[in-house]
């Protein structure tokens, strides 16, 4: 192949040529570099790989077969059902310190509930509610109001205000 060398620059002395202006002696300032001839290589060598070859190959391991999960039979337990449910409860509160007075009683036999409750309203009357509930008639309540027996008001004893006599001063002299 051909290998080109870089071009070279040569300078020549400059002289005044009279009415023709300035100019250089001789030829051009730029000259081509000589062409060098280089022989092409006859063969190329492949690079040497410096990697060790594996000593042996192993087959992939065999996976164990997995069985499907075993179905477990579940027994269904039915909720207990009482065709004739029964209950009864009650309470009574009589608090002399706070004046709280209330009570309630209730009972159930099958689908029928009966009961009552009472309390003292802020105006001093006792309210009593009697109720029943069943699938045919629904919930029904009857309200009774009755005044409480007023407590006898005991008058506080009157305290007489007596002024103490003035102390004896022994008279007044002129």
From Swiss-Prot:
It holds the Pfam family Chitin_bind_4. GO terms for cellular component: extracellular matrix; extracellular space. InterPro entries: CHIT_BIND_RR_consensus (IPR031311), Insect_cuticle (IPR000618), Insect_Cuticle_Struc_Prot (IPR051217). Coiled coil: none annotated. GO terms for molecular function: structural constituent of cuticle. Sequence repeats lie at residues 45-48, 67-70, 155-158. Transmembrane segments: none annotated. Component of the cuticle of the larva of Tenebrio molitor. The tetrapeptide (A-A-P-[AV]) repeats found throughout the protein are also present in many proteins constituting the protective envelope of other species. This is Larval cuticle protein A1A. It comes from Tenebrio molitor (Yellow mealworm beetle).
